[in-house]
């Protein structure tokens, strides 16, 4: 299958990328692969969410039935010891650590909602299709990904439900797997992307 853009990963970054691409060029063929059975299934974290990026991506997000509803009403900053804690006044914290006007959200629900927005723009989303292999052109550039075969037993034999993996080719492939993505690690090694870099 051929696309203009193939996105690997259905978290906030991958979904925001898909949305922005379709906003900029509605004619682009964009697909997004997510390894989980549904968008948000592997996003288990809660979050204190600052909306600036969402305000830029979807300025009318409040009108789109977003799951972002609960504003931070109170916060504390504590230094924790073995037996005691020390409270620190929040007004002494740097602005980036203050949560005034931020929201308390479920990242899973945010991702599900972002997926709805992406699909409404024409993004094709394929949950339950983990990308298992990076595909390369002869010149070494990335040309897409392949999904893993389905219906394989523990010994590696094909079951009756076997379906071969598919190749998704893109003029551009975006890897948005998160910091522990196995394909991203392969790219970092192949192209020496971490040489001379601080991991933070």
Language model segments and positions:
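N-terminal FAD cofactor-binding segment of flavoenzymes
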Residues: 35-84
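Conserved Rossmann-like nucleotide-cofactor binding loop
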Residues: 13, 38, 180
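Helix-loop-beta segment of a Rossmann-like dinucleotide-binding subdomain
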Residues: 86-107, 116, 144-146
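Predominantly flavin-linked oxidoreductase catalytic cores and closely associated redox partners
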Residues: 112, 117-200
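Short, hydrophobic/amphipathic alpha-helical packing segments
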Residues: 12-18, 108-115
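Short, solvent-exposed loop/turn and secondary-structure capping segments
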Residues: 42-44, 89-90, 185-188
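N-terminal Rossmann-like FAD-binding beta1-loop-alpha1 element of flavoenzymes
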Residues: 3-31
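Glycine-rich, phosphate-binding/catalytic loops in enzymes
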Residues: 24, 47-50, 190-193
């Amino acid at each position: 299958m051929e696309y203009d853009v193939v996105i690997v990963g259905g978290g906030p970054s991958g979904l925001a990328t898909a949305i922005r691409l379709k906003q900029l060029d509605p004619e682009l063929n964009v697909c997004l692969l997510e390894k989980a059975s549904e968008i948000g299934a592997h996003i288990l974290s809660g979050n204190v969410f600052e909306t600036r990026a969402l305000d830029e991506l979807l300025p009318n997000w409040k009108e789109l039935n977003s799951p972002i509803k609960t504003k931070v009403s109170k916060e504390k900053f504590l230094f924790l010891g073995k037996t005691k804690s020390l409270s620190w006044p929040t007004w002494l914290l740097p602005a980036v650590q203050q949560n005034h006007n931020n929201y308390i959200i479920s990242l899973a629900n945010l991702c599900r909602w972002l997926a709805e927005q992406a699909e409404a723009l024409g993004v094709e989303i394929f949950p339950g299709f983990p990308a298992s292999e990076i595909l390369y052109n002869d010149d070494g550039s990335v040309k897409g990904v392949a999904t893993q075969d389905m219906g394989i037993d523990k010994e590696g034999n094909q079951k009756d439900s076997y379906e071969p993996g598919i190749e998704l080719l893109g003029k551009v492939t975006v890897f948005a797997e998160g910091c522990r993505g196995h394909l991203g690690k392969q790219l970092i090694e192949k192209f020496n992307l971490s040489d001379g870099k601080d991991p933070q």
